[in-house]
Every structure is written in C-alpha cells, then in structure tokens.
Amino acid sequence: MEQAKAVAKQVRIAPRKVRLVIDLIRGKQVGEAIAILKHTPKAASPVVEKLLNSAIANAEHNYEMEPNNLVISEAYVNEGVTLKRFRPRAQGRASRINKRTSHITLVVTEKKEG
C-alpha cells in the first residue's frame, strides 16, 4: 500500500509537549485532523498542521492519491538535539537549562474501501 510521509526536524518544542497534540490526530482522517488542530490551543498545533498539509501535498503530488481518502496511519515524535543554555542564579551560580527539540513524523495512507 502506498504511503506518503512528511518529517519536520529540529522543531524547537519539547517532544513531551508535541506528543500531546500528535496523540489527538493519530488514526484520524486528514480533514478531521486539520479541524482538531485548528481548535487545539497548543504551541505545537500550527507546526503539526503545517506538517500534515505537507504530507497531504506529498501524497497528492508524488503518489497521485486522493486527498479526501487519506488517513493518518503513523504519527510519532522523536527527541532531537538538546540545546544547553545557562541561567544566572543567586550567589554567582548558574543553572543549566535544556532547550529540547523534536523530530516529528507523519505518514498518510489511502483509506481502504469497505
């Protein structure tokens, strides 16, 4: 079965926060998923929505799939590189702040007939 995918790497949002959004759309039809993302007040929502639109465009252009029949078959988030930063603290000390990044992957396939 044909599948189209889109990957966003080094997204500056923690994987734990992106997973909350990804879990909402996994297994859904793309139209329904876009509607869910538009009404989800999370920072990761616009990023995931843009990625989903990219996956739909890939399916349409590269594999000639029908956009109305697409379903999100796989959606997962992996941890990217962690940027280490320092925050000044009292008494001349410093604490390390981890700025986490994510690699987001969406795979869409055509819904089976019947």
Swiss-Prot record:
Gene3D superfamilies: Ribosomal protein L22/L17. GO terms for cellular component: cytosolic large ribosomal subunit. The keyword Cytoplasm does not apply. One of its GO terms (molecular function) is rRNA binding. It comes from the Bacteria. InterPro entries: Ribosomal_uL22 (IPR001063), Ribosomal_uL22_bac/chlpt-type (IPR005727), Ribosomal_uL22_bac/org-type (IPR047867), Ribosomal_uL22_CS (IPR018260), Ribosomal_uL22_sf (IPR036394). It holds the Pfam family Ribosomal_L22. Keywords: Ribonucleoprotein, Ribosomal protein, RNA-binding, rRNA-binding. SUPFAM superfamilies: Ribosomal protein L22. Signal peptide: none annotated. One of its GO terms (biological process) is translation. This protein binds specifically to 23S rRNA; its binding is stimulated by other ribosomal proteins, e.g. L4, L17, and L20. It is important during the early stages of 50S assembly. It makes multiple contacts with different domains of the 23S rRNA in the assembled 50S subunit and ribosome. The globular domain of the protein is located near the polypeptide exit tunnel on the outside of the subunit, while an extended beta-hairpin is found that lines the wall of the exit tunnel in the center of the 70S ribosome. Part of the 50S ribosomal subunit. Belongs to the universal ribosomal protein uL22 family. This is Large ribosomal subunit protein uL22.
